[in-house]
């Protein structure tokens, strides 16, 4: 059986721009993408802390070290410059791989939109795994 688990999270990044007439997607600083283990065109979920909007799109690389986070296409209507968002990506993980599965958590400095801290954590501890396998 497969379980859907959080794979990557970019926590509290500020929107730095919007381009309504771009094809679509979210443009994200390439350094932040790499830290979060996100690849170009990967599906992401976006949660806008300021207005409560939640939507799906895909991520494309922006200029490295720029701190950019740009909503493109229809998504540009769902957030404004300066809004704080959370970006999440999920993965289907086989139960036999749960013990080695790692989540990438990237925390953003709210003043500069650069990486404040990155953590790789085990998604599940042994007690949870024991309950899952019973």
UniProtKB/Swiss-Prot annotation:
Is synthesized initially as an inactive proenzyme, which is activated by self-cleavage at a specific serine bond to produce a beta-subunit with a hydroxyl group at its C-terminus and an alpha-subunit with a pyruvoyl group at its N-terminus. It comes from the Bacteria. The keyword Amino-acid biosynthesis does not apply. InterPro entries: Asp_de-COase-like_dom_sf, Asp_decarbox. Binds 1 pyruvoyl group covalently per subunit. Its cofactor is pyruvate. The keyword Cytoplasm applies. One of its GO terms (biological process) is pantothenate biosynthetic process. The modification Pyruvic acid (Ser) is found at residue 25. The active site is at residues 25, 58. Its EC number is 4.1.1.11. It is found in: Cytoplasm. Gene3D superfamilies: 2.40.40.20. Substrate binds at residues 57, 73-75. Keywords: Autocatalytic cleavage, Cytoplasm, Decarboxylase, Lyase, Pantothenate biosynthesis, Pyruvate, Schiff base, Zymogen. Pathway: Cofactor biosynthesis; (R)-pantothenate biosynthesis; beta-alanine from L-aspartate: step 1/1. It catalyses: L-aspartate + H(+) = beta-alanine + CO2. GO terms for cellular component: cytosol. It is an enzyme of class 4 (lyase). Belongs to the PanD family. Heterooctamer of four alpha and four beta subunits. This is Aspartate 1-decarboxylase. The lineage of its organism: Bacteria, Pseudomonadati, Aquificota, Aquificia, Aquificales.
